[in-house]
């Protein structure tokens, strides 16, 4: 049975990336060494990391005055990292909270530096973008562009009237284009759209580099100066990230993945909305995530049945987050149209079967 993996992360990888990774584990670039053995200060790895940085500049259209970093610790580490940088003693950090991960961030930030919390429900995001709330005194504004647990996405951050945004893009980076004009710093764990766990992509404006007296792995200036090699980096995760960026460029870059994201998410949302008698989509239209579609059945028993039968059909990763329940469909960059076809057919058959129990549930 073919598996269709819609996991929220670690997420599906394109088969070509898995195949190339397997080859590199056996023998990297005909060196006789496994990629797992390559020294992080070797010429081979230097070539790899430089090529990766060029790929990221290409994909994200990164300006020349921005740095790129590859760090460990995931997006959660970034809560501590950000709080200890960006002039923590003198600058107020504002936090736009639209869901669970943004709330976790502000809880961590507030233990380290002065923080202003701005709570915005999914129903208020559109109004907030059009008429920003009180940002008086806020020197940096942090937000999470896509809340994987809540199914809320804020893509129009370039319209926010603030010139120093800090953005957690862990679950939607690479799925739509954006401008850098008002972005101070962007970060993303790789394991959803860009690879596997272990490495985080960090991109920032060089004018925010500081000389704060932080310990080494909290010292933004030192990390940039050492080009992500202050200590031993997650070499294999970086290698897979390089493969993903190669693949993204070959597929057509950001424009390709943005078009695909719009097409696939629109199809599933429209389908679910046609079954309003059975399911609830708890997010307002403007804020609906293209990356993580959240919905619940009105009947809890039918929801359990839907998940069990999906697994039997080879459709995996649909369970909502343990804190929310429900269903979560994750449509990251690696999800193919064929996978969405299969899922869509299952949704139709499953929900028709609810109203016509004698009808066979076969795809």
Mark where each language-model region is.
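PLP-dependent aminotransferase-like
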Residues: 76-141
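Active-site phosphate-binding strand-loop segment of PLP-dependent enzymes
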Residues: 109, 120-173
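Single conserved hydrophobic/aromatic residue that forms the stacking wall/gate
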Residues: 352-363
């Amino acid at each position: 049975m073919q598996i269709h993996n819609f996991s929220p992360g670690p997420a599906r990888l394109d088969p070509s990336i898995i195949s190339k990774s397997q080859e590199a584990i056996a023998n990297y670039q005909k060196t006789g060494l496994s990629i797992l053995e390559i020294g992080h200060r070797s010429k081979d790895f230097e070539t790899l990391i430089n090529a990766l940085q060029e790929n990221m500049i290409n994909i994200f259209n990164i300006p020349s005055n921005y740095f790129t970093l590859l760090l460990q610790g995931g997006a959660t580490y970034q809560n501590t990292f950000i709080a200890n940088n960006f002039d923590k003693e003198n600058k107020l950090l504002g936090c736009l909270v639209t869901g669970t991960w943004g709330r976790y961030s502000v809880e961590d930030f507030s233990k380290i530096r002065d923080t202003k919390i701005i709570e915005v429900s999914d129903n208020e995001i559109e109004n907030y973008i059009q008429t920003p709330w009180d940002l008086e005194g806020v020197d940096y504004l942090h937000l999470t562009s896509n809340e994987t647990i809540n199914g809320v996405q804020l893509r129009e951050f370039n319209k926010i009237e603030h010139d120093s945004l800090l953005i957690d893009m862990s679950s939607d980076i690479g799925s739509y284009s954006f401008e850098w004009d008002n972005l101070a710093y962007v970060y993303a764990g790789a394991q959803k759209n860009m690879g596997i766990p272990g490495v985080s992509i960090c991109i920032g404006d060089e004018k925010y580099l500081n000389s704060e007296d932080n310990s080494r792995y909290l010292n933004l200036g030192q990390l940039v100066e050492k080009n992500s090699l202050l200590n031993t980096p997650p070499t294999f995760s970086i290698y897979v990230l390089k493969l993903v960026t190669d693949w993204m460029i070959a597929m057509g870059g950001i424009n390709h993945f943005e078009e695909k994201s719009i097409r696939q998410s629109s199809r599933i949302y429209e389908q679910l909305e046609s079954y309003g008698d059975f399911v609830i989509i708890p997010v307002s239209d403007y804020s609906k995530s293209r990356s993580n579609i959240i919905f619940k059945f009105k009947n809890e028993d039918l929801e359990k049945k839907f998940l069990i039968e999906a697994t039997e059909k080879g459709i995996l990763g649909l369970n909502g987050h343990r804190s929310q329940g429900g269903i979560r469909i994750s449509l990251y960059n690696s999800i193919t149209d064929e996978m969405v076809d299969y899922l869509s057919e299952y949704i139709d058959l499953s929900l028709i079967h609810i109203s016509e129990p004698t009808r066979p549930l076969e795809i």
